[in-house]
Amino acid sequence: MKLCGFDVGIDQPFFLIAGTCSIEGLQMSLDVAGLLKEACAGLGIPLIYKGSFDKANRSSGTTNRGLGLEAGLKILDEVRRQTGLPVLTDVHDESQVAEVASVVDVLQTPAFLCRQTDFIRAVAMSGKPVNIKKGQFLAPWDMKNVIDKARAAARDAGLSEDRFLACERGVSFGYNNLVADMTSLAEMRNTGAPVVFDVTHSVQKPGGLGGSSGGAREMVPVLARAGVAVGVAGLFMETHPDPAKAFSDGPNAVPLKHMKTLLEQLVALDRVVKTRPLLENDFSC
């Protein structure tokens, strides 16, 4: 599959979707994008910069939701202009799709909306690539139905069906807890879509701080290494210069100063995994 001019798939080096959770302003976005671009260029990692203009799914009605659609899109457009990076953001309802698609390179769907048929059809008919997140309540094999919905909508609109990514972001495991099942990453290959592992949201503790979500950022390197060892097309990781001051999801964000070292480890592991055939593809008795 071609994505933003580069090849993605289980047989390609992983690409990275990274940036702050919420868009916090133009200068911070440019600073983070610039540092990520420099780190990824040196390691040969294709990079898509991400930022959210609205955190619609919040633990509390009093927490920061972000800068809003108009301001957020202006910042993403400027980040793309100044850095040359492709940009990604989430859409939250059908009314936003056309406006967001006119600015960004890749759309993303929130995990909780993965079964909303009209919404999935709307993003699929935008003509843009779409990173479709698996719901925390969904079995990995059920993502095939979601991807099939998107492909059917694209087909109905006369558009390419080869534009969709299947993204794992953890599954609910009791109250205020998520776990990342590594077998899900392999199972989701059966969707026929490139599989992306959202590492940072997989260590989130939804609602774990009462009025906001907690997280275990120290487990991000652990899960990132595990996901790369399974074999994935892409990784999704949110980062921040000072996670304690982040507008949202600070507890599960990677401190920006550690991103390059983490990526160096992951690139080395990815090369080992992808220079050999995947045994699970021919593991019969």
UniProtKB/Swiss-Prot annotation:
Task: Kindly give the Gene3D superfamilies that the UniProt entry links to this protein.
Answer: Aldolase class I (3.20.20.70)
Which pathway does this chain act in? Carbohydrate biosynthesis; 3-deoxy-D-manno-octulosonate biosynthesis; 3-deoxy-D-manno-octulosonate from D-ribulose 5-phosphate: step 2/3; Bacterial outer membrane biogenesis; lipopolysaccharide biosynthesis
Q: Could you state a single Gene Ontology molecular function term? A: 3-deoxy-8-phosphooctulonate synthase activity
Reactions accelerated catalytically: D-arabinose 5-phosphate + phosphoenolpyruvate + H2O = 3-deoxy-alpha-D-manno-2-octulosonate-8-phosphate + phosphate
Signal peptide range: none
**What EC number(s) are associated with this protein in UniProt?**
2.5.1.55
Q: Which residues form a coiled coil?
A: none
Pfam entry (one): DAHP_synth_1
Where is this protein found?
Cytoplasm
Q: Identify which top EC class this enzyme belongs to.
A: transferase
What does the UniProt keyword field contain?
Cytoplasm, Lipopolysaccharide biosynthesis, Transferase
Tell me if Cytoplasm is a UniProt keyword of this record.
yes
Q: Tell me one GO biological process term.
A: keto-3-deoxy-D-manno-octulosonic acid biosynthetic process
Query: What's a GO cellular component annotated to this UniProt protein?
Result: cytoplasm
Family as reported in the entry's similarity comment: Belongs to the KdsA family.
In Swiss-Prot or TrEMBL terms, this protein is called: 2-dehydro-3-deoxyphosphooctonate aldolase
